[in-house]
């Protein structure tokens, strides 16, 4: 209730400054009914005059550069579970030992200035990046590329210094990739690092129209020759003639903008989403009903133990603290039950449900740990039913069909077993004082500091808050340490427990069953002592069985049927060892205003990942439908 009241107050304060704002103040001479307006997720643009995103410098790619201006060779879509061939017309072709990769270029694609996109652009992009250490992907390309060349206008050959069955993933867009640059522009530039690429030319379906020098907005206009882009060839004409990316600021200002029909796609908090759904009859969420959230995000949130420090290097302690979590209370505290729980170290998206969760559920039901010399089954398949029941008690409309409940809230999680957790802790020298508070083996009060970033609306912070409460209930003193330095502290191992960093496991590709991207971060070759920068997963956990899984994955194509088997083996090892705790899939909270446009991606029609900040946004635009309102 306090959160709602605070949100209303902030909303009213924002209204004072926003009430006079119209579209004419956002961009000049733009017909509103031909324009879709989306929020800039990453905030105000720090370098609005610079459109050169190839140097390893943050240049706000989500202002439309990655969504509209540039096409990749390939792009992955977590909603459909597919990899889309974009500027490449087919999958990469490898030789038997993965030391050569051939790329076939899609014919008939053109840069917006009329120059054809060819193999020359790809070859030049890679060679230029290898020449300048300030360029993104410089280290990776210099590590792997022996030679890159074309054999004809539409064929590129990469000869590699050493085998890499996933070399193509450097060009696979999933909120970041090496996207080809225009050779005919950059070859005339003396300094490609200092070059601002202004005005930019596009390989994608939109070109720059105008932008705010202050960094608040960028306006893009559909290319007249949109059909000569991968977007046009694959999906047809993008329906909006104009796309305006605008940074509105915090949620309350985005809510006001949507209520005034000046923002079609917003990045909201749950409080903001509830507000706009109540005040704008044209507003909707990804789901029509509770829990409203996006369930196709390829990230899983949760808890990270520092396995290089005691007692977190003890598997029994990690399991004790896992079983001390009542996940139903936890998700109620974190997101008012609006989540999909995940017992595995990958997101519980529909695609991964089919690839991994459902096949592994029988194994999860029989997963045991040893307590007092006896096996104890740790998995609880009834968790989603309990979440649904608690959500109903809060007044939410929740289905009663068990299958629907599992689709929404997940297949299950781990048991809340404080008695078992207590036995494991006592076995390892911990004990309770007369007030029931836990003491360490040396008799001192046990206090756990939980590291997290400072934004209370972030999923990381909400995990930390919920974790703090459930462990306190179990008798452990906790402190949430919220700091902007969380990333630095994690990189050098200066933490105990965290909900920040690289998630409980690095997110997978999202639209492909290959889990190498997730497992590879646990490779023991990355290990560094505390105090040194850690290039692998920040939990600093290593395991010889996981090393074997990773080594086998490196030997096979990511499309190999064996890959899924290896992925399952890796997930089993992570579940058994619990070096980190997965809690729930990242709950994306977006708001659509359907006053001017409809047919957004939704839970009923998940034809594309629904995020306007993802590079897939350009593939959403051909499917939008104008309402005809002026």
Q: What are the roles of these predicted feature ranges?
A:
Residues 58-60, 64, 70, 75-79, ...:
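Gly/Pro-rich hinge or "lid" segments in bacterial periplasmic/extracellular proteins
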Residues 129, 147-148, 209-221, 246-309, ...:
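Extracellular/periplasmic solute-recognition and catalytic clefts
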Residues 20, 29, 104, 139-187, ...:
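Surface-exposed binding/hinge segments that line
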Residues 90-135, 151, 157-159, 257, ...:
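Aromatic- and charge-enriched surface segment that lines or borders ligand/interaction sites
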Residues 21-36, 40-47, 64-65, 212-221, ...:
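Detector for C-terminal structural segments
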Residues 39-64, 86-90, 115, 137, ...:
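A structural "hinge/loop" feature
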Residues 112, 159-181, 200-253, 274-299, ...:
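Aromatic-rich, solvent-exposed beta-strand/loop patch
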Residues 22, 37-96, 127, 201:
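N-terminal lobe/hinge region of extracytoplasmic solute-binding protein
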